Amino acid sequence: TKLYYRTTAAAGTCSTSLPDGPPAAQPFCWQPYTSSVASSQIVTTTTDAGVTVPLIVKVERGTMNRGIYDIAVLVSDPTGPWTALAPQAGWNRKVYYTFGASTGQPRRQARPATNWSTQEAQLRRGYLVVQNSMTDSARNSNRVMMSETVMMMKEHIADTYGPIQYTLGTGCSGGSINSNMNASIAPGLLDGIITSCTYPDSETTTMEVADCTLLVAAYHKMRTTPLCRDVSQA
């Protein structure tokens, strides 16, 4: 578990890449926090619960159900305790779960496709943001295992951080499939979903794409075309 603070650098002048990743062309928007960092260097935010605090987040990285996960949450007291029975005031008790896009079954561990450092808007409002590579569609196409991983992550959050008011799921393309499939496989696991570039599932989407390819080929190579070449259209 590490602490990071949001610098006062304006958007577009700093990199939203993970601060513990490879060097970026611009300075990182998020920097490691220590008690020696001056408050003037840290952005201040007000959560949707009306709590105003410096924008400092606690980031937990671990493994769950074979996937690598990241959890980031706003802290109101960087050096103070946090228990499930006494969560810090920076968290609004809401969870924002991001599902990664694409589709695949590589059968290997990898870090989540979505970086917590890009979800500043949610962190500013007090949401706990979470990702797990086993809930990224590019890393795992077993939808039952994916839903099981979401359940295990929620259990870990409740045990470690405190009771959850509600959980929002979000994602694009394969991420939208996982959001929708959660609602089908385990109703109630997600209290709401916000999807973009949405598909219902991988099976019906694949059939539609395959049909389109075959039909386009057929229309361009119809055997009846020569018979109709000199026929006037009605």
Explain the meaning of each model-derived region:
Residues 70-118:
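Short, surface-exposed "cap/lid" segments of acyl-processing enzymes
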Residues 101-106, 129, 135-139, 173-177, ...:
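Solvent-exposed loop/turn segments at secondary-structure junctions
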Residues 1-91:
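Catalytic-loop region of hydrolases
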Residues 176-187:
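Short glycine-enriched nucleophile-adjacent loop
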Residues 190-234:
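A catalytic-pocket lid/entrance helix-loop region that shapes and gates access to the active site
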